[in-house]
């Protein structure tokens, strides 16, 4: 149930049905490199392109009813440093220097280098609920398969490892 697991293969659909990223790519082939807000409703990119601010949609919620907040964005970024997190993701997001909370629904991304793709890359970071996965003593790699709480349009109705998974809206 962990979309970033190093053990096994994530369940089909889990990454984009149960979990969400701040932005989603256009499904239209005529809009390459275009993204639209899923968890954010406004983006501010600095003129020098070294910082960016996301305004988090105040209506965004996780499947357990908790709101999606800046704390979840910061927590998700910090997961990239967890030794149990997937090393490919660490490499992919390495040029994002920091993610800092400005307010409950506003976060600032600071980039380590100038790279025109970094604003798009930030939009692809899966946002995990801090109140679920950030509990003291929880292991991102070991405890994740007990529960999958995400902000996506679906929840898991039932599953059996290696056999089936059923989603409900």
Regions found by a protein language model. Give the residues of each.
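Gly/Pro-rich hinge or "lid" segments in bacterial periplasmic/extracellular proteins
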Residues: 26-30, 124-169
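Surface-exposed binding/hinge segments that line
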Residues: 55, 91-135, 153-160
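Short, solvent-exposed loop/turn elements at domain surfaces
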Residues: 1-4, 30-33, 63, 117-120, ...
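Aromatic- and charge-enriched surface segment that lines or borders ligand/interaction sites
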Residues: 41-86, 102, 108
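Extracytoplasmic
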Residues: 17, 38-40, 47-49, 68, ...
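Solvent-exposed loop/turn segments at secondary-structure junctions
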Residues: 59-61, 80, 114-117, 161-163
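N-terminal lobe/hinge region of extracytoplasmic solute-binding protein
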Residues: 1-47, 78, 149
């Amino acid at each position: 149930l962990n979309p970033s697991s190093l053990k096994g293969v994530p369940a089909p659909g889990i990454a984009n049905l149960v979990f969400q990223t701040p932005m989603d790519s256009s499904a239209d082939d005529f809009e390459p490199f275009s993204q639209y807000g899923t968890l954010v409703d406004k983006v501010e990119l600095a003129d020098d392109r070294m910082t960016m601010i996301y305004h988090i949609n105040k209506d965004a919620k996780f499947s357990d009813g908790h709101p999606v907040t800046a704390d979840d964005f910061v927590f998700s970024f910090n997961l990239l440093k967890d030794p149990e997190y997937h090393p490919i993701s660490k490499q992919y997001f390495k040029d994002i220097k920091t993610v800092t909370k400005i307010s409950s629904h506003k976060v600032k991304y600071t980039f380590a280098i100038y790279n025109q793709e970094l604003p798009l890359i930030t939009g692809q970071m899966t946002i995990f609920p801090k109140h679920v996965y950030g509990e003291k003593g929880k292991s991102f790699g070991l405890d994740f398969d007990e529960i999958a709480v995400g902000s996506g349009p679906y929840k898991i109705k039932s599953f059996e490892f290696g056999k089936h998974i059923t989603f409900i809206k």
